[in-house]
Amino acid sequence: MRSNVLYSIETKSLTKSFGDETAVNDISLSVKDGEIFGFLGPNGAGKSTTIMILTTLLKPTSGQALISGFDVTTNAKLVRQNIGYVQQETTVDEYLTGRENLLLQAKLNHIQKDKIDKRIDEILTLIELTDKQDKTVVTYSGGMRKRLDIAGGLLHRPKVLFLDEPTVGLDIQTRRKIWQYIKKIHDEFKMTIFLTTHYMEEADQLCDRIGIIDDGKIQVIDSPENLKKAMGNEVISIIFEEGENRDSFLSELEKIEFVNKINKDGSKLTLFASNGPEVIPKIFYISSKLNIKITSISLTQPTLDDVFISYTGHEIRDGDSKFNQKREHAKMKRLRA
């Protein structure tokens, strides 16, 4: 049975356990029709497990997930007909041409023969690969391969497109070009896009709303702008040389007026303060008193990185994503064995 089609994705108390370990813990969220939704979380938070459930590759232990109103467990075939899934690792065959790859995808998705050529032409034009369609993929750049990957997920005109780390490993110029294509695809097809990323700028640029997951639980869901505004603080970042007075330094900082929260990540401290200029001289006074050497200090307005740190306690580090996905998949295999 179809549910409320105002929501392209709905989960209700979604849970997935492997033995004694709970990877996804009672997640309830709703993604509006036509929305670009970002799903963010640190290593091992449950992002990959959640996507595998939503794309019917893994069954939940309990709870429910609906895609376009269809249950991922009882209506898996209908769910697959309504989704496109572009994985982090490229899936194109590098010894086929771009067009041959899309022809293969069209056949796998059972697209009517009389519609295939027109559909491929439209997609190639949209992602600006028409002039490269007859070249073998082995000659493509990383950005071109990713565009072709995304094109393969669009051929059957899904209502929901899942993009798992779509720009990981690409340089910043290529990443921004992919962002433009994602926006273009969204505007052209009016589809819902569910995006995982560890690039905060990417989430800020693309997403209508984001959800932050940590330890298998949803911590917050809101628009990037609202999340930044809700911080209500300036951000003081400190890098210091750790020594025997480290704990005393942290304890003294917590007593400073206007300091509302402190996150520690190794030798880096992030302070959320309601009056940064008033706090900074006190930080230097305490560090001098305790003989703590500060190597760097900065005062900024809140960014999405700061929001993430506030809810999870640490940053998403560039380059961790690919390792984390392999680790999370390996953990799932081990626990199912």
Feature names for model-found ranges:
Residues L161-D164:
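Catalytic Walker B motif of ABC-type/P-loop ATPase nucleotide-binding domains
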Residues Q180-S274:
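ABC transporter nucleotide-binding domain
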Residues L103, K107-H110, D114-K132:
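Conserved ABC ATPase "signature" region
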